[in-house]
Protein backbone atom coordinates (compact mmCIF):
# COMPACT_ATOMS: atom_id res chain seq x y z
CA UNK A 1 0.00 0.00 0.00
CA UNK A 2 0.84 3.68 -0.04
CA UNK A 3 2.89 5.16 2.80
CA UNK A 4 0.89 7.87 4.56
CA UNK A 5 2.66 10.66 6.41
CA UNK A 6 0.73 12.66 9.01
CA UNK A 7 1.82 16.25 9.64
CA UNK A 8 -0.48 17.56 12.38
CA UNK A 9 -0.20 21.28 13.03
CA UNK A 10 1.51 21.90 9.68
CA UNK A 11 0.29 23.65 6.55
CA UNK A 12 1.12 21.94 3.26
CA UNK A 13 1.30 24.59 0.56
CA UNK A 14 3.29 25.47 -2.53
CA UNK A 15 6.47 27.41 -1.75
CA UNK A 16 6.07 31.16 -1.32
CA UNK A 17 7.73 33.79 -3.51
CA UNK A 18 9.35 36.79 -1.80
CA UNK A 19 9.60 39.45 -4.49
CA UNK A 20 12.02 41.75 -2.66
CA UNK A 21 14.33 41.05 0.28
CA UNK A 22 17.77 42.29 1.37
CA UNK A 23 20.23 39.55 2.27
CA UNK A 24 22.72 41.91 4.01
CA UNK A 25 20.08 43.56 6.21
CA UNK A 26 19.05 40.61 8.39
CA UNK A 27 20.85 42.13 11.40
CA UNK A 28 19.18 45.54 11.12
CA UNK A 29 15.56 44.33 11.29
CA UNK A 30 13.65 46.59 13.67
CA UNK A 31 16.18 49.46 13.75
CA UNK A 32 14.14 52.62 14.34
CA UNK A 33 14.53 55.77 12.24
CA UNK A 34 12.51 58.81 11.21
CA UNK A 35 12.32 57.59 7.62
CA UNK A 36 14.01 55.77 4.77
CA UNK A 37 17.05 57.99 4.12
CA UNK A 38 18.22 58.33 7.77
CA UNK A 39 17.61 54.59 8.21
CA UNK A 40 19.95 53.83 5.29
CA UNK A 41 22.60 56.18 6.61
CA UNK A 42 22.54 55.13 10.27
CA UNK A 43 21.98 51.37 10.07
CA UNK A 44 21.99 49.85 6.62
CA UNK A 45 25.10 51.31 5.01
CA UNK A 46 27.33 50.58 8.05
CA UNK A 47 26.04 46.98 8.17
CA UNK A 48 26.53 46.40 4.43
CA UNK A 49 30.21 47.37 4.67
CA UNK A 50 30.86 44.10 6.54
CA UNK A 51 30.07 42.14 3.38
CA UNK A 52 33.38 43.10 1.80
CA UNK A 53 34.75 40.18 3.86
CA UNK A 54 34.01 36.86 2.11
CA UNK A 55 33.67 34.99 5.43
CA UNK A 56 31.06 37.50 6.70
CA UNK A 57 29.15 37.17 3.42
CA UNK A 58 29.25 33.36 3.57
CA UNK A 59 28.09 33.27 7.20
CA UNK A 60 25.23 35.68 6.50
CA UNK A 61 24.21 33.72 3.38
CA UNK A 62 23.90 30.48 5.37
CA UNK A 63 21.60 32.09 7.94
CA UNK A 64 19.59 34.06 5.34
CA UNK A 65 18.84 31.06 3.09
CA UNK A 66 17.91 28.94 6.13
CA UNK A 67 15.48 31.66 7.32
CA UNK A 68 13.78 31.84 3.92
CA UNK A 69 13.32 28.07 3.80
CA UNK A 70 12.17 27.93 7.45
CA UNK A 71 9.40 30.36 6.50
CA UNK A 72 8.32 28.41 3.43
CA UNK A 73 9.91 30.78 0.89
CA UNK A 74 11.31 28.80 -2.04
CA UNK A 75 11.83 31.68 -4.52
CA UNK A 76 13.35 35.04 -3.58
CA UNK A 77 14.39 38.15 -5.49
CA UNK A 78 17.20 39.38 -3.34
CA UNK A 79 19.47 42.39 -2.98
CA UNK A 80 23.12 41.68 -2.16
CA UNK A 81 25.72 44.45 -1.61
CA UNK A 82 28.09 46.35 -3.88
CA UNK A 83 30.75 43.66 -3.26
CA UNK A 84 30.97 40.81 -5.82
CA UNK A 85 31.91 38.44 -2.97
CA UNK A 86 28.45 38.98 -1.42
CA UNK A 87 26.80 37.90 -4.69
CA UNK A 88 29.00 34.82 -5.06
CA UNK A 89 28.42 33.80 -1.42
CA UNK A 90 24.64 34.06 -1.75
CA UNK A 91 24.44 32.19 -5.07
CA UNK A 92 26.73 29.46 -3.70
CA UNK A 93 24.54 28.90 -0.63
CA UNK A 94 21.26 29.07 -2.59
CA UNK A 95 22.61 26.52 -5.07
CA UNK A 96 23.67 24.20 -2.25
CA UNK A 97 20.17 24.40 -0.68
CA UNK A 98 18.35 24.19 -4.05
CA UNK A 99 16.59 27.50 -3.45
CA UNK A 100 15.30 29.41 -6.47
CA UNK A 101 17.11 32.68 -5.98
CA UNK A 102 17.62 35.78 -8.10
CA UNK A 103 20.20 38.36 -7.03
CA UNK A 104 22.86 40.66 -8.41
CA UNK A 105 25.65 43.09 -7.66
CA UNK A 106 24.28 46.29 -6.12
CA UNK A 107 25.12 49.13 -8.52
CA UNK A 108 25.91 52.24 -6.51
CA UNK A 109 28.54 54.72 -7.67
CA UNK A 110 27.57 57.93 -5.82
CA UNK A 111 25.79 59.37 -2.76
CA UNK A 112 26.81 56.63 -0.32
CA UNK A 113 29.86 56.07 1.93
CA UNK A 114 33.01 55.83 -0.21
CA UNK A 115 33.92 52.29 0.82
CA UNK A 116 30.42 51.09 -0.06
CA UNK A 117 30.45 52.48 -3.60
CA UNK A 118 31.45 50.20 -6.49
CA UNK A 119 35.26 50.22 -6.41
CA UNK A 120 37.48 50.94 -9.40
CA UNK A 121 40.36 48.73 -10.45
CA UNK A 122 43.59 49.93 -12.05
CA UNK A 123 42.64 52.64 -14.52
CA UNK A 124 38.98 51.63 -14.57
CA UNK A 125 36.49 53.72 -12.62
CA UNK A 126 34.08 52.18 -10.13
CA UNK A 127 31.30 52.70 -12.66
CA UNK A 128 33.07 50.80 -15.46
CA UNK A 129 34.23 48.08 -13.08
CA UNK A 130 30.69 47.57 -11.70
CA UNK A 131 29.32 47.00 -15.21
CA UNK A 132 32.13 44.57 -16.11
CA UNK A 133 31.54 42.68 -12.84
CA UNK A 134 27.79 42.59 -13.54
CA UNK A 135 28.37 41.01 -16.95
CA UNK A 136 30.86 38.49 -15.55
CA UNK A 137 28.38 37.51 -12.81
CA UNK A 138 25.56 37.13 -15.38
CA UNK A 139 27.75 34.77 -17.38
CA UNK A 140 28.79 32.80 -14.31
CA UNK A 141 25.43 32.38 -12.55
CA UNK A 142 22.37 33.21 -14.68
CA UNK A 143 20.39 30.08 -15.48
CA UNK A 144 22.63 27.77 -13.43
CA UNK A 145 20.38 25.25 -11.63
CA UNK A 146 17.57 27.33 -10.08
CA UNK A 147 19.49 30.61 -10.02
CA UNK A 148 18.91 33.81 -11.96
CA UNK A 149 20.69 37.13 -12.23
CA UNK A 150 19.15 40.56 -11.64
CA UNK A 151 20.75 43.80 -12.84
CA UNK A 152 20.45 45.77 -9.60
CA UNK A 153 20.82 49.55 -9.35
CA UNK A 154 20.13 50.25 -5.66
CA UNK A 155 17.91 53.19 -6.59
CA UNK A 156 18.33 55.97 -9.12
CA UNK A 157 19.82 58.55 -6.68
CA UNK A 158 22.84 56.35 -5.88
CA UNK A 159 23.75 55.74 -9.54
CA UNK A 160 25.25 58.18 -12.03
CA UNK A 161 23.64 58.55 -15.43
CA UNK A 162 26.59 56.59 -16.88
CA UNK A 163 25.93 53.65 -14.55
CA UNK A 164 22.18 53.63 -15.27
CA UNK A 165 22.87 53.82 -19.01
CA UNK A 166 25.32 50.92 -18.75
CA UNK A 167 22.79 48.90 -16.75
CA UNK A 168 20.17 49.55 -19.45
CA UNK A 169 22.62 48.42 -22.14
CA UNK A 170 23.19 45.15 -20.26
CA UNK A 171 19.43 44.72 -19.84
CA UNK A 172 19.04 44.99 -23.62
CA UNK A 173 21.94 42.60 -24.26
CA UNK A 174 20.61 39.97 -21.81
CA UNK A 175 16.80 40.17 -22.16
CA UNK A 176 16.15 37.11 -19.99
CA UNK A 177 17.91 38.46 -16.90
CA UNK A 178 15.86 40.29 -14.29
CA UNK A 179 16.12 43.93 -13.26
CA UNK A 180 15.40 45.05 -9.69
CA UNK A 181 15.45 48.40 -7.94
CA UNK A 182 13.41 50.68 -5.67
CA UNK A 183 11.05 53.51 -6.61
CA UNK A 184 8.66 56.02 -5.03
CA UNK A 185 8.94 54.64 -1.50
CA UNK A 186 9.25 57.86 0.45
CA UNK A 187 8.50 61.55 -0.22
CA UNK A 188 12.06 62.74 0.57
CA UNK A 189 13.55 60.09 -1.71
CA UNK A 190 11.22 61.17 -4.55
CA UNK A 191 12.15 64.85 -4.16
CA UNK A 192 15.84 63.87 -4.23
CA UNK A 193 15.43 61.74 -7.36
CA UNK A 194 13.52 64.49 -9.16
CA UNK A 195 16.25 66.99 -8.30
CA UNK A 196 18.97 64.66 -9.65
CA UNK A 197 17.12 63.75 -12.86
CA UNK A 198 15.27 66.96 -13.81
CA UNK A 199 14.74 65.76 -17.40
CA UNK A 200 12.43 62.93 -16.25
CA UNK A 201 8.67 63.32 -16.03
CA UNK A 202 8.78 61.35 -12.79
CA UNK A 203 11.09 59.24 -10.64
CA UNK A 204 9.77 56.06 -12.30
CA UNK A 205 10.23 57.54 -15.79
CA UNK A 206 13.97 57.90 -15.04
CA UNK A 207 14.31 54.11 -15.10
CA UNK A 208 12.41 53.93 -18.38
CA UNK A 209 14.67 56.64 -19.86
CA UNK A 210 17.70 54.39 -19.22
CA UNK A 211 16.10 51.22 -20.62
CA UNK A 212 15.41 49.62 -17.24
CA UNK A 213 11.68 48.99 -17.55
CA UNK A 214 10.54 45.82 -19.28
CA UNK A 215 9.17 42.39 -18.61
CA UNK A 216 11.19 40.86 -15.71
CA UNK A 217 11.79 44.28 -14.14
CA UNK A 218 10.67 44.41 -10.50
CA UNK A 219 10.40 47.71 -8.63
CA UNK A 220 10.01 47.66 -4.87
CA UNK A 221 7.40 49.89 -3.21
CA UNK A 222 5.74 51.95 -6.02
CA UNK A 223 3.73 53.80 -3.37
CA UNK A 224 3.54 57.40 -4.55
CA UNK A 225 2.43 56.98 -8.17
CA UNK A 226 0.13 58.93 -10.45
CA UNK A 227 -1.79 57.35 -13.32
CA UNK A 228 1.01 58.11 -15.79
CA UNK A 229 3.37 56.03 -13.63
CA UNK A 230 0.81 53.24 -13.38
CA UNK A 231 0.33 53.26 -17.16
CA UNK A 232 4.12 53.10 -17.63
CA UNK A 233 4.26 50.01 -15.40
CA UNK A 234 1.48 48.42 -17.42
CA UNK A 235 2.87 49.27 -20.88
CA UNK A 236 6.42 48.09 -20.10
CA UNK A 237 5.36 44.88 -18.31
CA UNK A 238 7.27 45.82 -15.14
CA UNK A 239 5.93 44.66 -11.77
CA UNK A 240 5.75 46.16 -8.28
CA UNK A 241 7.05 44.36 -5.18
CA UNK A 242 4.66 45.54 -2.47
CA UNK A 243 6.35 45.60 0.95
CA UNK A 244 3.72 46.35 3.60
CA UNK A 245 5.63 45.55 6.82
CA UNK A 246 8.48 47.76 5.66
CA UNK A 247 6.15 50.58 4.62
CA UNK A 248 4.46 50.49 8.02
CA UNK A 249 7.76 50.28 9.93
CA UNK A 250 9.46 53.15 8.07
CA UNK A 251 6.25 55.18 7.79
CA UNK A 252 6.64 55.42 4.02
CA UNK A 253 2.98 55.31 2.99
CA UNK A 254 0.53 52.75 1.65
CA UNK A 255 0.50 50.99 -1.71
CA UNK A 256 -2.62 51.96 -3.65
CA UNK A 257 -4.11 48.60 -4.64
CA UNK A 258 -7.24 50.21 -6.08
CA UNK A 259 -5.16 52.49 -8.31
CA UNK A 260 -3.01 49.59 -9.48
CA UNK A 261 -6.08 47.49 -10.29
CA UNK A 262 -7.84 50.36 -12.05
CA UNK A 263 -4.92 50.89 -14.46
CA UNK A 264 -3.98 47.23 -14.44
CA UNK A 265 -0.30 46.63 -13.70
CA UNK A 266 1.26 43.61 -12.03
CA UNK A 267 2.27 43.44 -8.38
CA UNK A 268 3.19 40.84 -5.78
CA UNK A 269 4.16 40.72 -2.11
CA UNK A 270 7.57 41.13 -0.54
CA UNK A 271 9.03 41.04 2.97
CA UNK A 272 11.67 43.73 2.29
CA UNK A 273 13.72 42.54 5.26
CA UNK A 274 15.41 44.50 6.92
CA UNK A 275 13.10 47.55 6.48
CA UNK A 276 10.47 44.83 6.64
CA UNK A 277 10.14 43.20 10.03
CA UNK A 278 9.63 39.50 9.27
CA UNK A 279 10.69 36.79 6.84
CA UNK A 280 7.24 35.22 7.24
CA UNK A 281 4.90 35.48 4.23
CA UNK A 282 2.01 35.20 6.70
CA UNK A 283 3.14 38.38 8.48
CA UNK A 284 3.49 40.06 5.09
CA UNK A 285 0.00 38.98 4.02
CA UNK A 286 -1.54 40.23 7.26
CA UNK A 287 0.21 43.59 6.87
CA UNK A 288 -0.99 43.78 3.25
CA UNK A 289 -4.53 43.25 4.52
CA UNK A 290 -4.17 46.10 7.05
CA UNK A 291 -2.61 48.38 4.44
CA UNK A 292 -5.41 47.56 2.00
CA UNK A 293 -7.95 48.69 4.59
CA UNK A 294 -6.04 51.89 5.38
CA UNK A 295 -5.10 52.65 1.76
CA UNK A 296 -4.79 56.12 0.30
CA UNK A 297 -7.85 56.19 -1.90
CA UNK A 298 -10.48 53.83 -0.64
CA UNK A 299 -11.31 53.41 3.03
CA UNK A 300 -12.24 49.89 4.01
CA UNK A 301 -10.85 48.05 0.99
CA UNK A 302 -10.51 44.46 2.14
CA UNK A 303 -7.93 42.41 0.26
CA UNK A 304 -9.43 39.07 -0.55
CA UNK A 305 -7.17 36.06 -1.22
CA UNK A 306 -8.01 36.47 -4.94
CA UNK A 307 -5.64 39.44 -4.93
Summary of predicted features, one role per range:
Residues 185-217, 222-235, 248-258, 273, ...:
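Catalytic core of soluble alpha/beta enzymes
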Residues 85, 90-222:
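Metal-coordinating catalytic core of metallo-dependent amide/deamination hydrolases
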Residues 15-26, 178-187:
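Histidine-centered catalytic micro-motifs
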Residues 1-13:
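Histidine-rich, glycine-flanked metal-binding segment
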Residues 10, 30-100, 130-144:
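Alpha-helical scaffold segments that flank or form the walls of functional sites
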Residues 9, 20, 28, 72, ...:
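Divalent metal-coordination and catalytic microenvironments
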Residues 209-216, 258-307:
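His/Asp/Glu-enriched, well-ordered alpha-helical/loop segment
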Residues 61-68, 239, 247-249, 294-307:
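C-terminal helical cap
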Amino acid sequence: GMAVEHLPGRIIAPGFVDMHVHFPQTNVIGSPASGLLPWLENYTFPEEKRFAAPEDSAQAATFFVAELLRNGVTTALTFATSHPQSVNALFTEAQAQRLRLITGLCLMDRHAPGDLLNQGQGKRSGTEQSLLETEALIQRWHGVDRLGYAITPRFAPTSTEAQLRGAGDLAAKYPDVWIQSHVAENKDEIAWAEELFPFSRSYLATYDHFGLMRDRAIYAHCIHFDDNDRALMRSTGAAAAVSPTSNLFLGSGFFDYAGADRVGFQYGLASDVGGGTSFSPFHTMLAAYYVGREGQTKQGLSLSPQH
